Swiss-Prot record:
SMART domains: HDc, KH. One of its GO terms (cellular component) is plasma membrane. HAMAP family: RNase_Y. It is found in: Cell membrane. The chain crosses the membrane at residues 2-22. GO terms for biological process: mRNA catabolic process. Residues 334-427 form the HD domain. Residues 208-271 form the KH domain. Coiled coil: none annotated. This is Ribonuclease Y. Keywords: Cell membrane, Endonuclease, Hydrolase, Membrane, Nuclease, RNA-binding, Transmembrane, Transmembrane helix. The keyword Repeat does not apply. InterPro entries: HD/PDEase_dom, HD_domain, HDIG_dom, KH_dom, KH_dom_type_1, KH_dom_type_1_sf, Ribonuclease_Y, RNase_Y_N.
């Protein structure tokens, strides 16, 4: 019995232990499940929060972009509206200016008419006085006629009538001549004014320097070279003076010949861009620049011919036209002057129902002699006539060239128009400068004196005419003869030129030995 009770007791204890263990295991499992569920809920909440945040950011960006677009559209509309307002205001100002000009013109016309009316009133008063005198005279004559026979009275009346008609005829002829002259002058003035108003031209004075910009100050030393070899080579090959001073990152090219100066500028730009600067490279770039300059000159000529709508020009003549772009006359660019003359002559020819193309052609090449006047003897008129004859231009064009300075008589109205257009172009304010022309002419004369010697290969006036650099053939001139040549040129300069200060004469005799290794 006791054993049974003990067994039951142990069974109960064991059952309770097992139950406690099972219950504890279930509670632990529930805790783990709850923690897992909480973790899932937290992750889900975080994901939803991130999604909501991204959606909010997208909505905010869209809203900001929409607002930005609205602001831009509003700004553009306002800007467009302001531009329209400005345009309307400008149009209104222009209309007011036109109305003001019209009113001024009307006032001037009214004043002129008032003066004419006053003049006519004065004439009427004078005629009234004259008529009264004539009436008195006629009455006196009638009294005399009353004492004459019928035949004598008839003869006297016929004689007086004939004399009166003769005087009236002479007065009418004189009045017609004066009216025709006045109308012709007025018509000519109107034609010239219309041509000038339709032709726009720049008033730009040509200069004798060009500036080359450098990437750094160190480039100046490379341009000068060791012991100045590079700069001397460039100056000798181009005849242009290089001025290297304290001006930051720039070199000034000085020379009166625009072609030489442009060649030197092109060569120096190429050398600076390439970076290799030495005497042999300088010679190569100068030669390349000369070829490029020939092409540029041709393009300038073609552009001028195309601008004026001319055809049938000889290619060599077109190239000569391009060379005029690098010539100046009293500071005025010769090509621009010639184009302006061609346009003026063409417009006046159109007003007078003449050949417009022929007038433009004659105007364009009227100064063609200036393209070669530095190389060939003779005035630019003589050289221009020779060139026009060489390229088979029409006699009217040749005569326009020959007569535009009054050297020969004009044989056609076209020649007169060209001369008038030339005078208009040269006479407008700012077109020409006497001092620059005299300066350039002095430099040309200085070079001509040096080149007049047979031993001279070429000569360049540099340093604004304070130095002439003479290059001679080493096979023809010795060192001793070079000194004599410098003295002779110096004497010729002193005798033939007037100049301030002094002029340095430098004779360069250079010997080169060249061989090739194979």
């Amino acid at each position: 019995m006791v054993v049974t009770i003990i067994s039951v007791f142990f069974a109960i204890v064991i059952g309770l232990g097992i139950g406690y263990y099972v219950r504890k295991s279930q509670d632990a499992h529930k805790v783990i499940s709850a923690e897992q569920m909480a973790t899932n809920i937290l992750e889900q909440a975080n994901n939803e929060a991130k999604s909501l945040k991204r959606a909010a950011e997208v909505d905010a960006k869209d809203l900001a972009q929409t607002y930005r677009n609205q602001v831009n559209d509003s700004y553009n509309d306002r800007q467009k509206h302001l531009q329209q307002q400005e345009q309307r205001l400008e149009d209104r100002i222009n209309n007011l200016d036109k109305k003001d000009a019209a009113l001024n013109q009307r006032d001037a016309s009214l004043i002129q008419k008032e003066n004419q009316v006053q003049t006519r009133l004065d004439d009427a008063d004078k005629k009234e006085v004259l008529a009264q005198k004539l009436l008195t005279t006629q009455q006196d004559k009638l009294e005399e006629i009353a004492q004459l026979s019928p035949d004598e009275a008839k003869k006297q009346i016929l004689s007086e009538t004939k004399a009166s008609l003769t005087r009236q005829r002479a007065a009418l002829i004189k009045e017609a001549e004066e009216e025709a002259t006045s109308e012709a002058e007025k018509r000519a003035r109107n034609i010239i004014v219309q041509a000038i108003q339709r032709s726009s031209a720049d008033s730009v004075a040509d200069v004798t320097v060009s500036v080359v910009n450098l990437p750094s100050e160190d480039m100046k030393g490379r341009i000068i070279g060791r012991e100045g070899r590079n700069i001397r080579t460039l100056e000798s090959l181009t005849g242009i003076d290089l001025i290297i001073d304290d001006t930051p990152e720039s070199v000034v090219l000085s020379g009166f010949d625009p072609v030489r100066r442009e060649i030197a500028k092109m060569a120096l730009d190429a050398l600076v861009a390439d970076g290799r600067i030495n005497p042999s490279r300088i010679e190569e770039m100068v030669e390349k620049s000369r070829r490029q300059m020939d092409e540029t000159i041709r393009e300038k000529g073609e552009q001028a011919v195309f601008e004026l709508g001319l055809r049938g020009m000889h290619p060599d003549l077109i190239k000569m036209i391009g060379r005029m772009n690098y010539r100046t006359s009293y500071g005025q660019n010769v090509l621009q002057h010639s184009i302006e003359v061609a346009k003026l002559a063409g417009m006046m020819a159109a007003e007078l129902k003449m050949d417009v193309a022929l007038a433009k052609r004659a105007g364009l090449i009227h100064d063609i002699g200036k393209a070669v006047d530095a190389e060939v003897e003779g005035s630019h008129v003589e050289l221009g006539v020779r060139l026009a004859e060489k390229f088979n231009e029409k006699p009217i064009v040749i005569n326009a060239i020959a007569s535009h300075h009054g050297d020969v008589a004009a044989i056609s109205p076209i020649a007169e128009l060209v001369a008038a257009a030339d005078a208009i172009s040269a006479a407008r304010p700012g077109a020409r400068s006497e001092s620059l022309e005299n300066y350039v002419q002095r430099l040309k004369d200085l070079e001509a004196i040096a080149n007049n010697n047979q031993e001279v290969h070429t000569a360049y006036a540099i340093q604004a005419g304070r130095e002439v650099r003479v290059i001679v053939e080493p096979t023809k001139v010795t060192d001793l003869q070079a000194k004599v040549l410098a003295h002779d040129i110096k004497s010729d300069v002193e005798e033939k030129l007037e100049y301030p200060g002094h002029i340095k004469v430098t004779v360069i005799r250079e010997t080169r030995a060249i061989d090739y290794a194979h």
